[in-house]
C-alpha cells in the first residue's frame, strides 16, 4: 500500500484560512493559528449578526413609524392599536416605507386608525 503524504491537503487548508483572513490586522492575517481563530470568530459574529439584523431593522421601522405618527398627532402604540381595530394588516416594514416615501398615504392610515379607536381607549373590549 502506498504511503499517504498530507502536505498538499495541509497547505491547501492553510492557504484557504490565510486567504479568508486577508485584510485582518497584524498576526491575524499572517500566522495560521491566529488567522484560524479569527476566521472562526468572524464566522460566529457573522451568524449572530445575521440574526440580530432582523431586530435592528424592526427597531428602525418602529422609530420611523413613531416619528411620522407623532407628526400626524398620534403615538406609535395608538396607531398600531387603531390599525388592528380597523382590521388593516400592514406590516411595520411597509408602514415605515409609507411614512418615509408617501406621507399622504400614511396620513390616511393614521386617520383610519384614529376613527377605529374607541373614544375611551382604556375601556374594556367588547366581547
UniProtKB/Swiss-Prot annotation:
Keywords from the named record: Ribonucleoprotein, Ribosomal protein, RNA-binding, rRNA-binding
Family matches, as InterPro entries: Ribosomal_bL20 (IPR005813), RIBOSOMAL_L20_CS (IPR049946), Ribosomal_protein_bL20_C (IPR035566)
Calcium listed as a keyword: no
GO annotation, cellular component aspect: ribonucleoprotein complex; ribosome
Family: Belongs to the bacterial ribosomal protein bL20 family.
NCBIfam families: rplT_bact
Protein name stated in the entry: Large ribosomal subunit protein bL20
Species for this entry: Streptomyces avermitilis (strain ATCC 31267 / DSM 46492 / JCM 5070 / NBRC 14893 / NCIMB 12804 / NRRL 8165 / MA-4680)
Lineage: Bacteria, Bacillati, Actinomycetota, Actinomycetes, Kitasatosporales
Amino acid at each position: 500500500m502506498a504511503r499517504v503524504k498530507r502536505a498538499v491537503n495541509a497547505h491547501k487548508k492553510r492557504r484557504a484560512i490565510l486567504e479568508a483572513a486577508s485584510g485582518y490586522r497584524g498576526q491575524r492575517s499572517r500566522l495560521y493559528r491566529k488567522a484560524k481563530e479569527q476566521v472562526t470568530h468572524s464566522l460566529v459574529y457573522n451568524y449572530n449578526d445575521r440574526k440580530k439584523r432582523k431586530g435592528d431593522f424592526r427597531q428602525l421601522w418602529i422609530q420611523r413609524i413613531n416619528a411620522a405618527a407623532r407628526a400626524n398627532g398620534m403615538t406609535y402604540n395608538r396607531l398600531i392599536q387603531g390599525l388592528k381595530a380597523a382590521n388593516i394588516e400592514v406590516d411595520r416594514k411597509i408602514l415605515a416605507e409609507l411614512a418615509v416615501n408617501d406621507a399622504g398615504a400614511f396620513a390616511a392610515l393614521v386617520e383610519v386608525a384614529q376613527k377605529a379607536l374607541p373614544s375611551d381607549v382604556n375601556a374594556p373590549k367588547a366581547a
